[in-house]
Amino acid sequence: MTEITAALVKELREKSGAGMMDCKKALIETNGDIEAAIDWLRAKGISKADKKSGRTAAEGLVAIAGAGHKAVVVELNSETDFVARNDAFQELVRGIAEVALSTDGTVEAISAATYPASGKPVADTIKDAIATIGENMTLRRAAKLEVEHGVVATYIHNAAGDGIGKLGVLVALKSVGDKAVLTSIGRQVAMHIAATNPLAIRAEEVDAAVAERERNVFIEQSRESGKPEAIIEKMVEGRMRKFFEEVALLSQAFVINPDLTVGAAIKEAEKTAGAAIEVVGMARLLLGEGVEKEEADFAAEVAAVAKG
């Protein structure tokens, strides 16, 4: 039987990223064969990852990659903020964003794409990271914007490092105007989107079901006034106009200069850019948005650990 030396364990640990005791056991099980031990650890790691995959991942990071005419934003969730501060996790989410640039920007396409550092699909690379880092992780959402002429401006809020943070925004500006001007106004609009979370770019693009729900609420509220139906209809129309102004990007008061709407601010920028500017897309990913975090019972958690 091959002697399992400290140097052999160290080599396996460096190659696999697994713990020392796991590496030693793997080498014993495979009679000191490094490659076989890596496979053994991978099998064990996949098993551990599968057990962890049922746990809620609501922390993590949002990452942005790209500039110029295209950019992507991705959300990689973890179970704890502690792991999100881990260098390996941060490198992983940045790498996934870079990979996403060469895809159509859907989670499915990104998951199937090859992660250069591992030579494996992104989905498998995440699974390996689950086994190594020890928490469930989920590539939850992604968005990609691209323009033939113009820029896709980006903004990260609460940045945890270069291109990573808790909130990421993309905004696509179609224009043949000056790129520096487009990038500047684009970043300002992206910051505005981060702050206000508009439902659509233009009023007519607001989801019909959302608008109808608001209209019904306004009708019921207005009827409580006891006024005639003709008056109620005018009241509702007025409130709907205000609603659209508040939720559509171009009609919102610009956070950088509240005296202007976003649309008016873009019109002003056109003078410097030397060409028309059209907002043709936006994406806003807030970390953990819509994910219900588990409220763990401490006593039950301790009992679960005690049971192994």
Swiss-Prot record:
The keyword Membrane does not apply. GO terms for molecular function: translation elongation factor activity. InterPro entries: EF-Ts_dimer_sf, Transl_elong_EFTs/EF1B, Transl_elong_EFTs/EF1B_dimer, Transl_elong_Ts_CS, UBA-like_sf. Keywords: Cytoplasm, Elongation factor, Protein biosynthesis. Residues 80-83 are annotated as: Involved in Mg(2+) ion dislocation from EF-Tu. GO terms for cellular component: cytoplasm. It comes from the Bacteria. It is found in: Cytoplasm. PROSITE patterns: EF_TS_1, EF_TS_2. Belongs to the EF-Ts family. Associates with the EF-Tu.GDP complex and induces the exchange of GDP to GTP. It remains bound to the aminoacyl-tRNA.EF-Tu.GTP complex up to the GTP hydrolysis stage on the ribosome. NCBIfam families: tsf. PANTHER family: ELONGATION FACTOR TS, ELONGATION FACTOR TS, MITOCHONDRIAL. HAMAP family: EF_Ts (MF_00050). This is Elongation factor Ts. It comes from Rhizobium rhizogenes (strain K84 / ATCC BAA-868) (Agrobacterium radiobacter). The gene is tsf.
